[in-house]
């Protein structure tokens, strides 16, 4: 039997195994090092090993070091209640420590000698300032640092003798200043799309206790004294009742507000908003990057909703729809289902240029009825309207503007998405009310949005119109003044029309005038359902920024919702106005977004065509690199 063939194995020397192993490890480590260095280059940027890299602008190398003035001389004005003066300063200390920014509390004498390495000076109610202290503040600003002040700062000398408003107006860039002590609580309305807007809703109406307020006459204030409908108090211009401003003074940044920064203990939600305003002011004054998400798509600065209430007079409404269609604008028509069922073709025409929504079954208020009774009527109206034209009926306008706390619950039970709410205005943008959809899935929420009517409707304006019998430009101006106010806030303007009032043919020229002006502005004109779709998707997006080197800022955008968000913009407040900007993604599959440097406040607008659901985006912003 033949022996099986065999092969001889070659034995490599042990040194060869060691050589190949070492070479393989060296190659692997080299590749990992190259990848790591590429990642560093794509995030931190080029760096020097033996020397520190110099920034193009010193603001990029500064940290946050806060000095708070505890002014005993100013406290003497509160001799009967010294604690009232100390409370705002103590709140500043608590807020800063909670943020991880331990402040340095200084005396009047220390302020007069200089501020050392501080980058932000806080002056809570420092009315009494001596000559040396004023000089220190002016030098501090000339060095490009930041000051945050409140109340009648600098209106008295070191002996607390009255000196006038010159120091305050010079500090803030205001034309004039005054004091005002209301007898009751008053409302303060905050502008939107500003550096503090991440947690303060646009047009937020904040009630503050009766106190001595300091008012400025200043252009483009961040907050102003208002009434319940977010209108400037006493019919004055917004600029004449300014309660908060931010301003560039020389090379420095100034934030000022004229109200107390503490609220009663039971107002914890509103207090957290004020605390956020304080912290955001510190970051902005210290020239740290801040990112906020824009309110509206396609670079628009506000939104407008054309709402037509159709009751009985469908002929006027049909003519009105033809006018709006000729203007190329969408509108939302609110109909009660009883009348709409008899005018099916008209309702289809309304739907073709926008959206049909509900006024209930009969056009009578639901206020005061039990939630179940309200829900049954709302559900029936929804079914009847959807039989006329296929499509979802998602919106409801309370007849005569009357609703109660049960209405929003009934709307959710009946499958609606929004209410055009007139009562209890809280802000200039939609307020989302969520409901647990299932006890087994507590994190799944149904949402109903309140769209507040923060402007007068045609009934109010026509009732107060005293112009010529033939409508003139003055009548259109009554609507447009409200539109400009809401646009300034960055909110939603509701152009609310009754078919039997402004829908009459003799007012068509006025309507066309108003619509032409709205269309010419950077305002997103849309329907109620589209507005709510956008706002609920936007509400799930978070943005954040941080400085990672003397030339680079990291921008993080996360869409945590289940719907894509299209044509959104992020406004990035930069430490300074760079000459050259580049934006790159740290993930190679992401495209770099388009961007534009705005001509105020060192703001970089970054535009995103789509933010996909459940997706995080990280970009590096390179400044003068």
Question: Language-model segments: what does each one mean?
Answer:
Residues 155-156, 161-163, 301-304, 321, ...:
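Metal-dependent polysaccharide deacetylase catalytic core of the NodB/CE4 family, i.e.
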Residues 598-625:
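C-terminal beta-strand-rich structural cap/linker in extracellular carbohydrate-active enzymes
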Residues 301-312, 414, 451-530:
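Catalytic grooves of carbohydrate-active enzymes
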Residues 181-250, 443, 451, 474-475:
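Catalytic beta-strand/loop cores that center a nucleophilic Ser/Cys/Thr
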Residues 127-197:
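A glycine-rich, often tryptophan-bearing local segment used as a flexible ligand/cofactor-contacting loop or short
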Residues 206-213, 558-579:
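Surface-exposed beta-strand/loop patches in extracellular or lumenal glycoproteins
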Residues 16-117, 263-265, 280, 284-287, ...:
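Aromatic-Pro/Gly-enriched surface loop or interdomain linker
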Residues 100, 214-305:
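N-terminal pre-catalytic segment of deacetylase/amide-hydrolase enzymes
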